[in-house]
Design a protein with these regions (language model features):
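Periplasmic-binding protein-like
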Residues: 132, 202-212, 255-276
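Short beta-strand->loop
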Residues: 96-107, 126, 256-266, 276-278
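A bilobed periplasmic-binding-protein/Venus flytrap-type ligand-binding module shared by bacterial periplasmic
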Residues: 135-142, 178-179, 269-282, 301-304
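Extracytoplasmic ligand-binding site segments that recognize negatively charged/polar headgroups
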Residues: 31-38, 82-228
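Early extracytoplasmic/lumenal segment of secretory-pathway proteins
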Residues: 24-89
């Protein structure tokens, strides 16, 4: 009997170690955003399914997961990615293709997932996570009596002298520049991308940043992590900063007197993709975790911690019924969503196909432009 008890004890120990060893690794952008994911649906999913969920930070792109696959040592399971990366990753066989309504849960009322998400996915390897904004902000305590209200003010160094914080990559910057230079987005932002694709369009947009960065009254500080723009504004290193609306919102909630300017915002989408051949792909744990995290309740949960809009219509309904939704129990979150009517009077809808088709050529030009500053 004692031998049997010892054997059972040893077996339970082995099983517990085995279970904990096969944690699902989710890769995201770090800072307040990853914290909102972890608290909003990562931890609840782990508790419900009994599958540990680990979070790893990265700075975007597919180079790291490609290196893992080439080395035959894949450690990532689920990656938070841009639309263009789901297209490229799907085409190159990096990500798993989904059977959408089978793999993802319906809304509480029974509506199929494909109908509950706001719009279709850019590839068969993508499931929507959040909708967010590339906009800009300023520090109300340091800006002076004149306040920026339009996107063109970001480039006006006569009216608003001082350095600007600018995203390190070309994506979003070209759309911002061409719009600030007088191009209205048009229906579905078609005009924005037609102007960029026209002869001289890319050079026209990049020229706006060349002028801004070389201006003695201006100057550029390039950022690569979402936490940087609010920090640069708070410490006075820049007078304005492009960034992600959720990061600016969190800084506001922490007491930094930032003001967001929504004119000309770029409404963008973020997606989850599952790595083909990852540790959690083999045993099915990654799909279980992904299904739970992207449920109605899961996506609504992240909006308790950051001002990014969940992809599901049913998630917004839960938020509206549960206001004040923010973690402080006092702040209504729906008005802070980038999709709120007051914030979408003039906006650009990110076109992932444009970037998937042109990013290599554009990025080469962009990096050459930065090197010449």
């Amino acid at each position: 009997m004692k031998k049997l008890s010892k054997l059972l004890l040893a077996l339970s120990f082995v099983l517990s170690v085995t279970t904990s060893a096969f944690a699902v690794t989710v890769v995201s952008w770090g800072g307040a955003y990853t914290e909102s994911q972890k608290l909003g649906y990562g931890d609840p999913t782990a508790a419900k399914l009994g599958i540990p969920v680990n979070w790893v930070d990265y700075t975007g792109g597919l180079s790291e997961i490609k290196a893992q696959k080439e080395a035959g040592k894949i450690t990532w399971d689920i990656i938070d990615v841009y639309a263009k990366d789901t297209i490229i990753g799907c085409d190159e066989g990096i990500f798993v293709e989904f059977d959408f309504d089978k793999d993802f849960s319906p809304a509480p009322g029974g509506t199929a997932a494909s109908e509950d998400f706001f719009t279709g996915m850019p590839s068969k390897c993508a499931v929507g996570n959040i909708l967010y904004s590339w906009n800009f902000a300023y520090n109300d305590a340091t800006i002076g009596s004149k306040k920026p209200t339009k996107l063109k003010d970001f480039f006006d160094t006569k009216k608003f002298p001082g350095k600007r914080a600018v995203y390190k990559g070309a994506m979003s910057n070209l759309e911002i520049a061409i719009t600030a230079d007088g191009v209205n987005p048009g229906k579905g932002s078609d005009l924005t991308y037609r102007k960029l694709e026209a002869d001289g369009g890319i050079d026209r947009a990049m020229g706006m940043f060349t002028k801004l960065c070389n201006d003695p009254n201006g100057g550029c500080v390039f950022w690569n992590a979402g936490a940087q723009p609010p920090e640069l504004l708070a410490n006075g290193e820049v007078v304005m900063a492009t960034g992600w609306n959720g990061r600016f919102f969190n800084a506001q909630m922490e007491g930094t007197p930032l003001v967001q300017v929504w004119d000309g915002q770029i409404l963008d989408y973020e997606y989850f993709a599952m790595v083909k051949g990852g540790p959690g792909d083999a045993d099915g744990s990654a799909m279980k975790v992904l299904r739970e995290m992207t449920s109605t309740e899961g996506l609504a949960g992240s909006a308790k911690y950051i001002a990014y809009a969940p992809w599901r219509k049913s998630s917004i309904a839960i938020m509206e019924a549960g206001e004040p939704w923010f973690k402080d129990g006092k702040t209504n979150m729906v008005p802070h969503m980038p999709t709120a009517p007051a914030n979408t009077k003039r906006y650009i809808l990110m076109n992932p196909d444009f970037w998937a088709d042109n990013q290599d050529e554009i990025n080469e030009k962009w990096e050459a432009m930065k090197a010449g500053l």
